[in-house]
């Protein structure tokens, strides 16, 4: 609904769409994809085993002040849009709780640099190269590393009723600076956290 403010749409969606669906189909499994608000986090926590949600690394690490204060940072512009810090904190507490109904969802979007840095830029963060180390940094900050593997690898497939992946990756606590940009032919893509240092990296 274009009449609903972009920062209010998630809460309105819960009220007008999600709750009526769940009332009509109480045992329908629903994944609330890429939640961004305190209302959504609380709604999932108050729900039953048929309701889950994914959360992106950018919504755990940033809020709208990071995107807008002191100049627009187009590479943090994504949809659903970043919200107030109170919503960011609610998401962080949700993943730190260890609830098995929250799980990884990167929503990675590798838009070309010139399509992000324009008068009408594309929405999305290209976090595929470093999403796992970024999530690890969040869980470490929250003192919740014991829930990190489940959030990334176990909660999702168990919710969907799928077998767990038998392959594995290993992280090491080695600070790694993220590239400023990634060449793509004659173009380039700016990765999530470009130029910043993460304390975790994937082990070769």
Curated annotation (Swiss-Prot):
Assigned EC number: 3.5.2.3
Name of protein: Dihydroorotase
Residue sites binding Zn(2+) 2 per the record: 34
Organism for this UniProt entry: Serratia marcescens
Residues given in the record as substrate binding sites: 79, 111, 123
UniProt-listed InterPro entries: Amidohydro-rel (IPR006680), DHOdimr (IPR004721), Dihydroorotase_CS (IPR002195), Metal_Hydrolase (IPR032466)
Any GO CC annotation of this UniProt entry: cytosol
Record flagged with keyword Hydrolase: yes
UniProt cofactor note: Binds 2 Zn(2+) ions per subunit.
UniProt family annotation: Belongs to the metallo-dependent hydrolases superfamily. DHOase family. Class II DHOase subfamily.
PANTHER family (alphabetical): DIHYDROOROTASE
């Amino acid at each position: 609904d274009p009449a609903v403010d972009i920062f209010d749409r998630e809460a309105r969606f819960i009220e007008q769409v999600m709750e009526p669906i769940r009332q009509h189909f109480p045992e329908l499994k629903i994944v609330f994809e890429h939640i961004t608000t305190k209302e959504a986090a609380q709604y999932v926590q108050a729900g039953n085993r048929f309701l889950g949600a994914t959360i992106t690394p950018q919504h755990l690490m940033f809020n709208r002040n990071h995107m807008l204060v002191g100049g627009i940072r187009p590479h943090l512009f994504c949809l659903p849009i970043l919200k107030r810090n109170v919503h960011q904190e609610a998401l962080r507490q949700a993943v730190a709780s260890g609830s098995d109904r929250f799980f990884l969802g990167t929503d990675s979007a590798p838009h070309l640099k010139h399509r992000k840095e324009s008068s009408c830029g594309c929405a999305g963060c290209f976090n595929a190269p470093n999403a796992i180390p970024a999530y690890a940094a969040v869980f470490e900050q929250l003192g919740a590393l014991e829930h990190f593997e489940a959030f990334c690898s176990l909660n999702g497939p168990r919710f969907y009723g799928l077998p767990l992946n038998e392959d594995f990756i290993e992280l090491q606590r080695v600070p790694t600076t993220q590239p400023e940009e990634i060449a793509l032919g004659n173009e380039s893509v700016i990765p999530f956290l470009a130029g910043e240092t993460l304390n975790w990296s994937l082990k070769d």
